[in-house]
Amino acid sequence: MFDAKAFLADVPHLPGVYRMYDAKNTIIYVGKAKDLKKRLSSYFRSQLASKKTEALVANIHHIETTITHSETEALLLEHNYIKENQPKYNVLLRDDKSYPYILLTKHQHPRITSFRGSKKVAGEYFGPYPNAGAVRETLNLLQKLFPIRQCEDSYYKNRSRPCLQYQIGRCLAPCVESYYSQAEYDNQVNLVRLFLQGKDGQVIEHLVQKMENAAQELDFEAAARFRDQIQSVRAVQEKQFVSNERLDDLDIISIAYQHGIACVHILFVRHGKVLGNRSYFPKVPNNTDLSELADTFVGQFYLQMNQHRTIPNQIIIDQPLSESAALADVLSEQAGHKVSIADKNIRGDKSRYLALAKTNAEAALTLQLKQDTHIRQRYDSLKTLLNLAEIKRMECFDISHTMGNQTVASCVVFDENGPLKSDYRRFNIEGITGGDDYAAMEQALLKRYSRHLEEEKIPDIIFIDGGKGQLNRALETFASLNVSWDKRKPLLIGVAKGVERKAGLETLLISKWDKEIHLPPDSPALHLIQHIRDESHNHAITGHRKKRQKAFTESGLESIAGVGAKRRQALLKYLGGMQGVKAATLEEIQSVPGISKQLAEVIFDTLQHS
């Protein structure tokens, strides 16, 4: 039993971080404190604040502390420990994907495109947007409003005449010198920049001036073009709520909580416009109060700087934060600009945004509760069918290829909450006879399971998308494993498609019973299995298509020694693309600038035998 009195005797009255461990030496909670002794003493009073704290204290085996220079340093260190260890009793942010941005490249003819990741590419970044869909929607809108290019640089460099985008009025064709005016292209780029900065009024003023100048010069075709642009921008304005107040960049956060599930909804406001929104469902230990949830979520969300999140000028939240001043100082230091946090007395348009965030949070939570109930019903049905006391983790495998080429295997993971997408995996299958799905499945299973697995990562069920042959190969593969974990734990189940390959006609092959089961089409257990199988199928197909597309787009020139990027570009340009290169004679290849006779022979021979 943990001797709290002896431990507390040596804890100093200094700021720092503490880590609580259980008997398995696993970190179960990470916290920080302005005064470590006072904070840690509060856990061992006779009357504890909540049942959650009681459960936490009952599991403490030992505690480690790290003294820091300041509360600010403790805050940063705390979130690093939480992110690294994912402790059981901490609120955990599950979705830590980086946000997409719109990038306006630094180029003679700038390109506008979506971007996610570290901002290493030179150019101007606008955002963040809540998801890739919001970026695509904005890019589609921009292409209709402002005719600047969105094509890849490699495509742009190899054009000898305008593409379809020019013909339908969505690009000025800067790739072809005789078709565009540099001044007009620069003008359109500037309009895009102003539009993305939220300065719609300046965009319209500029276009009105251009329209009037064109009319005075009797260039009525250009005047009509500018008129249409003005109408399009105004139509976009009418669809958006734009604040009359002068607002900086804001993130508006509202928290809804019911039946042990929390929804944190964020509105991203930039230049007075709502760029988009996103709902998060953090993992919340039982009996967690909302103030702790708010503190932990905001800290984790903005301090995970490796996710390339942009910290706004102001964060507005509808729950009081216990350490808003310290958190604002840390965020200001991380962001390189002043960051304020407002958790009370919100007025004006900001209160309207907060009300909107609250409505969205409550709606998203209601939907999530319904979905969770639905998922639990399906899980209960599957547990009853298989006579299992619990199902914590399920994995499913599928194989995808085209006539035996570019074979990819997928593994998707489900837990009690549904798809666990952070644990999804794909495996490139190599060194087998093309089209041998049994060998592909064996290789995928070996890649996945022939190594050490943590206890919680061992699946209770493994679904194999295939019939008796696939299941038997999977059983043989498992029998051959030499691993430290219990390889007998997972229940292997084959999911064979019906004769007509229609949903609802699947046959389940249960390995432990050595028999087939046909479930009725309205069975909740069958619906869960279909969901898992379809998810695995889609994941495999997506990976296969990417691999196939890569093989298709890689011209075959990449593997030829002596043919670098410039020579590839010259070959494609002078011979009319890859089809032209493959159809070219030896003499035609040799005539391309930079290609010697010897290199031309190598290129010709390689392509003829590929």
UniProtKB/Swiss-Prot annotation:
One Pfam family recorded for the sequence: UVR
Occurrences of domain UVR (ranges): 201-236
PROSITE patterns linked to this entry: GIY_YIG, UVR, UVRC
InterPro entries: GIY-YIG_endonuc, GIY-YIG_endonuc_sf, GIY-YIG_UvrC_Cho, HhH_motif, Hlx-hairpin-Hlx_DNA-bd_motif, RuvA_2-like, UVR_dom, UVR_dom_sf
Domain of life of the native organism: Bacteria
Matches recorded under SUPFAM superfamilies: C-terminal UvrC-binding domain of UvrB, GIY-YIG endonuclease, RuvA domain 2-like
CDD domains xrefs: GIY-YIG_UvrC_Cho
GO molecular function, one term: excinuclease ABC activity
Disulfide bonds: none
GO biological process: nucleotide-excision repair; SOS response
Ranges where the GIY-YIG domain occurs: 13-91
GO cellular component: cytoplasm; excinuclease repair complex
Keywords (A to Z) from UniProt: Cytoplasm, DNA damage, DNA excision, DNA repair, Excision nuclease, SOS response
Subcellular location: Cytoplasm
Family, as annotated: Belongs to the UvrC family.
Function: The UvrABC repair system catalyzes the recognition and processing of DNA lesions. UvrC both incises the 5' and 3' sides of the lesion. The N-terminal half is responsible for the 3' incision and the C-terminal half is responsible for the 5' incision.
HAMAP family assigned to the protein according to its UniProt record, in alphabetical order: UvrC
Assembly and oligomerization: Interacts with UvrB in an incision complex.
Protein name: UvrABC system protein C
Organism lineage: Bacteria, Pseudomonadati, Pseudomonadota, Gammaproteobacteria, Pasteurellales
